[in-house]
Amino acid sequence: MRILCTNDDGIHAPGLKVVEEIARALSDDVWVVAPELDQSGVSHSLSLNDPLRLREVGPRHFAVRGTPTDCVIMGARHILADKAPDLVLSGVNRGRNVAEDVVYSGTIAGALEGTILGLPSFALSQEFTLETRNAPLWDTAKAHGPEILRKAIKAGVPKNTVININFPACAPDEVAGVMVTRQGKRNQGFLRIDERHDGRGNPYFWIGFERIAVVDMPAEGTDLAALAAKYVSVTPLRLDRTDEAFSATLAKTLG
């Protein structure tokens, strides 16, 4: 089985080494094609106005000056043009990708691009806490990732579905189990705009995050609830985002 690994944290990110280790537990035919620079939050961005620069950093290891989407296309359509990959793994992201993160995540986008190309694809992310922010518990992903992937692959991933896996911020032996979940929703009040000024007094801005008190517990069955209970969250996400239920209502209203 030929496996293509990518991420959004960049070619030198610790999590990329983790996903490669997970991949090697499944196959010895592992290829890494990852962004030259950190691409966190770029979502499913595709480089159309800038050329892609490709650099071989080692055997079967390539850096692309582009997005995770660019990397998967470059890997599947150029580097591995002679024999396409059988599986795409994107991650392991430093930090969870749950709830609304799904829309912003370059990690998930890398897996989504694999799905678009007709390849079984998985996004993997490791949650951290304030205490483990500088040293996420990568051993949790290493310990549980291979077996979860084996079972999910055996189940047969539908062609238009990507699997989003999030590992809880706890030691491997503290993981409560594996839970198949749905995408959660959280209070977006933590987003803020931070205004600053440069040396000439001109304003510039950062999108930032601030800690807010958690009032309500996450809804049962969601990715958020699973991680809070120390479960590995496994969420099947569909490429087709059509709201079928509302489509019928809208058709009656507009028809």
Curated annotation (Swiss-Prot):
The keyword NAD does not apply. Pfam families: SurE (PF01975). Binds 1 divalent metal cation per subunit. It is found in: Cytoplasm. Its main location: cytoplasm. GO terms for molecular function: 3'-nucleotidase activity; 5'-nucleotidase activity; exopolyphosphatase activity; metal ion binding; nucleotide binding. Gene3D superfamilies: Survival protein SurE-like phosphatase/nucleotidase. Coiled coil: none annotated. It catalyses: a ribonucleoside 5'-phosphate + H2O = a ribonucleoside + phosphate. Its cofactor is a divalent metal cation. Keywords: Cytoplasm, Hydrolase, Metal-binding, Nucleotide-binding. One of its GO terms (cellular component) is cytoplasm. It is an enzyme of class 3 (hydrolase). A divalent metal cation binds at residues 8-9, 40, 93. Its EC number is 3.1.3.5. InterPro entries: SurE, SurE-like_Pase/nucleotidase, SurE-like_sf. Belongs to the SurE nucleotidase family. HAMAP family: SurE. Nucleotidase that shows phosphatase activity on nucleoside 5'-monophosphates. This is 5'-nucleotidase SurE.
